[in-house]
Amino acid sequence: MDKWYKKIIGARTIKTGLATFLTSLFCLMLDLTPIFAILTAIVTIEPTAKASLKKGYRRLPATVIGALFAVLFTFIFGDPSALTYTFSALFTILVCTKLNLQVGTTVAVLTSVAMIPGIHDAYLFNFFSRLLTALIGLVTAGLVNFIVLPPKYYQQIEDNLTQSEYKMYELFSSRCNELLLGKFDSDHSNDLLNKLMGVINKTETLTGYQKDELRYHKNKEDEWKRLKNISNRSYIDRLLATHLSNIIYLPKHIHLVFTPEEKIAIIKISNSVNNIIKSNHFEPHRSSASTLKSSVKRLEEFDQNQIKSHVIYEILLIYKLLDSRYNDK
């Protein structure tokens, strides 16, 4: 099921269509105008059931505020009147912002200005009917989002993790080459790192969505285990990216001089990291790591080569994390 519909139409689009159909059906059965309920239903479909409920709690009172101002200013200025539309929109935005209901402001304003032409003299009826239709849209969309095609981001998360890891390994290898060639300030590496961090941030967002969704679906022990493994992998990737950024973002106008032994050690480690992409295996170089450790130990606390010590230390931390990931099993 997950495979065929995603190639044609997304699950969230399907749920939006279903919520729109059911909402309009219920409203028509109750002889209510469905447009306001549909607006609420469409914006209530969120990436997770938790997000739908959380934002729904704020969208409903925001819609009530919009309907209230529409009725109030229609009563004061009448319809048609430019002042009715202006003050309805303006005060709806102001009050929603003041009450921290920004997530519902758009729907509240649309509801407010759209209902003005149909109010006439039926002030109370229109107010309560808009309240009822908004509630129908909110509840219907929330149930659809909870029951129909619960979001599963596992495959997307794992694909993102694999993509970010390969990009990270390539960037580490190329950055080591730049350092050995004396290119300490690199716009190319900066750009690649920014793109990498974008993928990592997206992965962490999707992981958060999946965690929120699982809280509403009990008895999913296998999925919790899978999510835990994904979260641990994502956490290590974040650490690796942090250490990698520390050898990319260096002070301007620095100059590092590596000994021949240090250069050979860095080359061996960077090649081993780059080979993970092909072999999915990290070949440790204990002697190279020992060489770099000795270089760090020889430097004094306030040595003029402290930046060099910092760079080598970050390389060793990346080496240690990868060694633990691929060899401590």
From Swiss-Prot:
Its main location: membrane. Keywords: Cell membrane, Membrane, Transmembrane, Transmembrane helix. One of its GO terms (cellular component) is plasma membrane. InterPro entries: ArAE_1 (IPR010343). It is found in: Cell membrane. It is a multi-pass membrane protein. Coiled coil: none annotated. The chain crosses the membrane at residues 25-45, 60-80, 87-107, 108-128, 131-151. Belongs to the UPF0421 family. This is UPF0421 protein SH1063. It comes from Staphylococcus haemolyticus (strain JCSC1435).
